[in-house]
Curated annotation (Swiss-Prot):
GN (gene name): tbrg4
Residue span, RAP domain: 563-621
Protein name: FAST kinase domain-containing protein 4
Species assigned in the record: Xenopus tropicalis (Western clawed frog)
Superkingdom: Eukaryota
Subcellular location per the Swiss-Prot or TrEMBL entry: Mitochondrion matrix
CDD domains per UniProt: TBRG4-like_N
The keyword Mitochondrion is annotated on this UniProt entry: yes
UniProt keyword list: Mitochondrion, Transit peptide
InterPro entries: FAST_2, FAST_kinase, FAST_Leu-rich, RAP
Entries under SMART domains matching the protein: RAP
Coiled coil: none
């Protein structure tokens, strides 16, 4: 009972001492709270910081009310002055407080920014230095909002980080963090990521983030969410998770530019937050607002980086971007087409416009930007309608700087030209020189392993599609090392299911090979040789030039056909399409050039087959169709 009395009385006494000493009336009020009907406060309310906070708020309110008229008059005087000279002289002509000195410094910085003038001479001015001293001497009297603005303006004016007055302002801000409004915390977040350099400033940022983690529920507008996500979200994972929740809450209020910033913030941290991305996509599609090229380019980059597919958003991007392609810069076109290629999404009118823009503005496109176009077209197997003009321009520019390209980029470009059927002997010989390809075979990194595979594909292009080529080739021992890439790959359910059915369809040992690594760098799910009556032959004695180490020497009998079974999974196709990506078009071409009849098994047909009998009948039907097509040629 005594504890409850002390607890309740302390709250009333703390509030009353802010204005007047205790009186008989106060004591009487304290006695009244002993009535059992009054609610019991939690013990945490007795904490001394809570009592002090009541007093601080009361005193602050009293000071604010008394100084509002004075502040309003001085602010009107500041707004009437339009030059730096007048503002500096104001501090000399009249007696000012530290708060007013901070306001003058802030206004001086604004005028300098508007006039785009240099602030070096102003900072050295004796009157400006006197303003700094005045603000420093009375720093405790500067209002919170003015203090944050002062700190920002001192950074913008280029005040050195070891300046005594600047350090005093930083320390004061750090001590006041808990008393600053949430809006001021957001302003500090926007400020400090740009200007943080010294250890003290980094400590302030750390304290700022801790305060934001505790007070994130005070966010009341979409702009604050965007600012915090882009400026400090990467510092704290816990804060970023809270900000994502708030972004989901305010997604409907985001402008397209704010959606762009949120998407970029997620992409920068590789945070694939699907609910938030879906919400952004929904509101982008629902609003009948045109997207600017800058917004489309950044959104495409973010979606590509996060591998997030949303067809309706892509269609809106394309429709909004198509009429503006002639006005886009070469860099924006290159970035946009690269992002869409990552997403495996091809819009024919938009890509035609990109190709036409590169032809019309060829002098503005650098070689790296043209390389982005070629890589994207190769990945998607896109051929522009004006291919002769486009490739003529591209070859002319590319040959001029071929020796200057990074080896990795050079291999990518030549490989893409192989896909697009635009490679010639000069490109092939360049990448198959021992001095260039040897660096990829001595490097054991996963990245180099992928490029060794691409070199095998380029070598296969020279062997199968360019009989006139007389330059260097990859040695057999180098090609054998590329098999490790596919040998360690886990089979997809489609591949394992196909191989299982093939073994049942051709049960005689030696008549069917499954999981074949070829010298061309391609993986075949199954291989059989059938005679003219569609009966399988033993593969052991037959020559197999596609194998690294073939034991058979006997040529194929007349009338026999060699079949290659390849499974096409969902990732092998363009998004929302039945068109293969360029890599797998090249696979089919090379296998056909090597003498195979290719039996393609796409996922969208295989999934409809439920029983083993259906799958066996499906493969037999596929074989008959391929034979019929071959005979019809």
């Amino acid at each position: 009972m005594a504890a409850r009395l002390v607890q309740r009385c302390s709250r009333l006494l703390a509030a009353s001492t802010a204005y007047a000493p205790a009186t008989h009336t106060h004591i009487h009020e304290c006695m009244k709270v002993c009535h059992p009907a009054q609610p019991v406060l939690p013990c945490s309310s007795l904490h001394s910081s809570s009592l002090c906070r009541h007093k601080d708020k009361a005193l602050t309110k009293e000071q604010t009310v008394s100084s509002v008229p004075e502040h309003g008059k001085f602010e009107s005087v500041l707004e009437s002055l339009s030059s730096v000279e007048e503002l500096l002289q104001l501090g000399v002509d009249r007696e000012i407080s530290g708060n007013q000195a901070a306001m003058i410094i802030t206004q001086v910085s604004k005028v300098l920014m508007e006039s785009k003038a240099q602030g070096g001479s102003v900072v050295q001015d004796e009157r400006f230095q006197q303003l700094l001293v005045q603000a420093h001497n009375q720093i405790s009297t500067i209002w919170n909002g003015n203090l944050v603005s002062l700190l920002k303006r001192l950074y913008i004016l280029g005040i050195r980080e070891d300046n005594k007055q600047l350090q005093a302002v930083e320390n004061e801000v750090r001590w006041r963090l808990r008393r600053l409004s949430f809006k001021s915390l957001v302003q500090l977040s926007d400020l400090y990521v740009t200007f943080t350099r010294s250890p003290e400033q980094k400590h302030l940022v750390s304290d700022l983030v801790k305060n934001l983690e505790l007070r994130w529920t005070e966010i009341e507008d979409a702009k604050s969410v965007v600012t915090l996500m882009t400026r400090v979200g990467f510092i704290s994972k816990a804060l970023m998770e809270k900000l994502e929740d708030k972004a989901l809450e305010y997604a409907e209020q985001f402008t397209p530019d704010e959606m762009r910033k949120v998407a970029l913030a997620l992409a920068a941290q590789n945070r694939r937050t699907v609910p938030l991305l879906r919400a952004l996509s929904y509101h982008l599609v629902q609003r009948h607002i045109g997207l600017s090229p800058a917004v489309v380019v950044d959104l495409a980059f973010a979606y590509g980086k996060l591998n997030f597919h949303q067809t309706q958003v892509f269609q809106k991007m394309a429709s909004d971007l198509l009429p503006k392609v002639p006005e886009m810069s070469a860099n924006d076109i290159a970035r946009c087409v690269k992002s869409f290629a990552y997403l495996k999404w091809s819009n024919l009118p938009l890509f035609e416009a990109f190709a036409q823009a590169s032809i019309d503005q060829s002098e503005k496109f650098t070689v790296p930007q043209l390389c982005n176009l070629v890589l994207a077209f190769g990945r998607l197997n896109f051929q522009p309608s004006k291919r002769e003009e486009f490739y003529s321009m591209m070859h002319q520019k590319l040959h001029a700087e071929l020796d200057l390209l990074d080896p990795y980029l050079l291999v990518d470009i030549v490989w893409s030209l192989c896909v697009l059927r635009q490679v010639d002997s000069s490109y092939i010989s360049k990448v198959l020189e021992p001095g260039l390809y040897s660096r990829f075979f001595t490097d054991s990194s996963p990245r180099s392993a992928n490029y060794r595979l691409k070199l095998a594909h380029i070598n296969a292009t020279a062997l199968l599609e360019h009989p006139e080529y007389t330059g260097p080739h990859l040695p057999n021992e180098s090609i054998s090392t590329t098999h490790a890439v596919t040998a360690n790959r886990k089979l997809s359910p489609l591949q394992s299911g196909l191989q299982e059915v093939l073994r049942e369809l051709f049960p005689v040992e030696g008549t069917c090979r499954c999981g074949v690594n070829t010298v061309y760098g391609w993986y075949i799910d199954g291989e059989v040789v059938l005679d003219s009556d569609n009966k399988p032959l033993s593969l052991m004695d037959l020559e197999a030039p596609h194998l690294p180490h073939s034991q058979g020497k006997k040529p194929l009998p007349e009338g026999t056909r060699r079949f290659a079974f390849v499974a096409w999974d969902f990732p092998n196709f363009n998004s929302r399409s039945k068109d293969l990506l360029g890599r797998f078009v090249l696979t089919r071409r090379h296998l056909q050039a090597a003498g195979f009849l290719v039996v393609e098994v796409p996922y969208y047909e295989w999934l409809d087959l439920k029983s083993e009998w259906q799958k066996s009948a499906y493969l037999k039907d596929k074989i008959n169709k391929v034979v019929a097509e071959e005979m019809a040629r």
